[in-house]
Amino acid sequence: MKKIFLLMSVVILAAACKSAPVATGPEDNSGFKTTEANNQNAKGLNLPDGASVRETPRGKVLVLHDPKSKADVGKPGSTYEVKFGFDNTIEIGTYKDAYNLVYQIINNNSGIRIISEGHSSKEGPAPYNYKLSQRRSDKSYNYIIKLGVENSRLLKNAFGEALPEYPTLKENRRSEFIIIMTEDDLKKYNDFAKTVDINKETN
């Protein structure tokens, strides 16, 4: 009987660990309140020139356009991005510009929070890729904190290989930044995260 109970406990634990955890931050995040009166939708955001928002099922993803790029908006090379090398947490490309813009957006919008969100390509086992994406999320989170952002303004989460939103492996090794303007935004994000199976191998 004891063996059966232990086996059932393991099965329940495994099932509980399949979905991505909700966005987390420091303990004092509970004291931060979004200003819904001033931020009813993305149009209420104070964004720098070139920055925009991409609406997704999980929320508002920041798109940081590179004003120096000759590529058409939405095409590879047209944006500041936080990308990573294969199987590591070393940023490549225009990551410093991306981090600086995120910092600027947080400072210019007192009623928002940002989620630092880590991702990976599908190379390797999904559970390993999830851990890798957690480290990438941490790396981006810590960089922005060091720029001077209060930690109550920043959250973090990771999805491993579960959200391959870009056509190439290289593009999916990334951090993205989600804007949280209201408590409803955060609930929407966390509800979405609970539906994602982070242990499922991506085809």
Short names for language-model regions:
Residues 6-9:
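Sec-dependent N-terminal signal peptides
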Residues 15-16:
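C-terminal motif of bacterial Sec signal peptides marking the signal peptidase cleavage site
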Residues 20-112, 181-203:
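Periplasmic peptidoglycan-binding/tethering modules of Gram-negative envelope proteins
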Residues 111-115, 153-155:
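Residues at or immediately flanking beta-strands
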Residues 120-193:
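Periplasmic OmpA-like peptidoglycan-binding domain that tethers envelope proteins to the cell wall
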